């Protein structure tokens, strides 16, 4: 279920703010979104996996908190990010 190292590096390269950025809020949201998408497909194939469903809800909550932070700090950056990630909120 975890992200492969190559996929994680692709996401980091795509969303990092500068060359050494590995933990900005935008990047964290992008990584969480990828994990959420993977878990969603897993749960569609395994609907009785309640432990994974709980983990999914925790990830969604963490992403929601980061998105709220970005929205408060810079609304335009927030709009761009949800547009790039395809998140409806």
Swiss-Prot record:
Listed GO MF terms: rRNA binding; structural constituent of ribosome
Alphabetic keyword roster: Ribonucleoprotein, Ribosomal protein, RNA-binding, rRNA-binding
UniProt key word rRNA-binding: yes
CC terms in the record's Gene Ontology section: cytosolic small ribosomal subunit
InterPro entries: Ribosomal_uS15, Ribosomal_uS15_bac-type, uS15_NS1_RNA-bd_sf
GO biological process terms on file: translation
A Pfam family per the record: Ribosomal_S15
Domain of life: Bacteria
Role of this protein: One of the primary rRNA binding proteins, it binds directly to 16S rRNA where it helps nucleate assembly of the platform of the 30S subunit by binding and bridging several RNA helices of the 16S rRNA.
Subunit structure of this chain's protein: Part of the 30S ribosomal subunit. Forms a bridge to the 50S subunit in the 70S ribosome, contacting the 23S rRNA.
Family designation: Belongs to the universal ribosomal protein uS15 family.
Protein name according to UniProt: Small ribosomal subunit protein uS15
Natural source organism: Gloeothece citriformis (strain PCC 7424) (Cyanothece sp. (strain PCC 7424))
